């Protein structure tokens, strides 16, 4: 997460990296180098060490390295909700709740506005039976 939001603040690669996955002194938080977007939050919460030897879904590295460290974006993460507040917008559309079902590494976020009183059937009628007729189950079937 810090590597993605702060790619230039620290040295992240090589034998002289400031931090490695086994460092005991990784900062709890850092100020990001740029303003964080909704897409940045989604990417971080979907992260699974992609592009590294530790990626549990990737093909690089050996079997002992892949999945060695627990990533955020694993298939057991079932739901994401993000509130976006936009003070520069009219009040009735200034807040958006972004919702995503199923594993964050494989899902997509859908915007919901608080002022909207109805939701399309595909998004609202989940049902207890698995079906591709609704967004919830379609998302769950991907992962």
Spans of features found by a protein language model:
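C-terminus-biased signal that marks the final domain/tail of proteins
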Residues: 1-143
